[in-house]
Amino acid sequence: MTDFFFEYIFPLIIIALKVVAITIPLILCVAYLTYAERRVIGLMQLRCGPNVVGPFGLLQPIADAVKLLFKEPIIPINADKILFILAPMITFILSLIGWAVIPFSKGVVLADINVGVLYILAISSLSVYGIIIAGWASNSKYAFLGAIRSSAQMISYEVSMGFVIITVLLTTGTLNLSGIIEAQRTMPWWIDLMLLPMGIVFFISVLAETNRLPFDLPEAESELVAGYNVEYSSMGFALFFLGEYANMILVSAMTTTFFLGGYLPPFNISWLDCIPGFFWFVFKVGFLLFCFLWIRATLPRYRYDQLMRLGWKVFLPLTLFWVVLVSSVLFYTDNLPNV
């Protein structure tokens, strides 16, 4: 019995504790990211933002959560009730399970699998299903149009994101996310410089993937009222909201891992190794999240045809050309990784 416990039950308990240790801080980060967004945008617009609930407004996310929790969940009479309820759950759960392969520091990762990049791509591709189901199940033309926009937008930018990730794989030679970070420790500076344009393309693409300004067409208030979540209230709306912000943190972590060295110190400065890698990871993710908020506060929304044109006529040929360029340069300089 003891052998059975230590061989089968104990590993499951350890995995469950690791999941809780990642999920609870992540949900708190999502809650306070909404607070940070309102404060940053308020300061950029020369106003205070939330500053009443608690000192400096720090209890505002808790007040918002309590308000949404006690609101009445209203399901439209013609909606597909089961799918209507499942859609926000799918969106929120998929935004959390992507964190299983993200390395927070050296050796600190829930599942250090050798196909981590494929896992992340699969999860990011599945996340659109929650939005499509919500648009269909709501039985509303605004919600359905928002869902169609979201699916077209994600398909358009997944292609260029895939080519960008191929350039990263060409330089690192591994699908393991920890391996990608460690490969950047010894990577020549000119390869980092060659990947810089792809890092910018990747960041713009994840703006479109997460439906953030200037690409928030699926929920454009002036055109679609609120898009795919127009019929949602109470915790259904809250789960969509949490899913969007959890996705923001996830794609910031992906960008950090692929292009900013993950938990490595900036520019591989050796005397900064004394600072824990987790600090550098959080610092880089926080910087990218600030860029998300900065962009929302400063840029206007694209038209839908401009969004599609950027994805298919600019990013797709550019990333395809860059894959050929990077592979050619690495081949002729004999810097292709040994796999």
UniProtKB/Swiss-Prot annotation:
This is NADH-quinone oxidoreductase subunit H. Disulfide bonds: none annotated. The keyword Cell membrane applies. NDH-1 shuttles electrons from NADH, via FMN and iron-sulfur (Fe-S) centers, to quinones in the respiratory chain. The immediate electron acceptor for the enzyme in this species is believed to be ubiquinone. Couples the redox reaction to proton translocation (for every two electrons transferred, four hydrogen ions are translocated across the cytoplasmic membrane), and thus conserves the redox energy in a proton gradient. This subunit may bind ubiquinone. It catalyses: a quinone + NADH + 5 H(+)(in) = a quinol + NAD(+) + 4 H(+)(out). It is an enzyme of class 7 (translocase). It comes from Rickettsia akari (strain Hartford). InterPro entries: NADH_UbQ_OxRdtase_su1/FPO, NADH_UbQ_OxRdtase_su1_CS. Its EC number is 7.1.1.-. One of its GO terms (molecular function) is NADH dehydrogenase activity. The chain crosses the membrane at residues 9-29, 82-102, 115-135, 161-181, 187-207, 235-255, 275-295, 311-331. It is found in: Cell inner membrane.
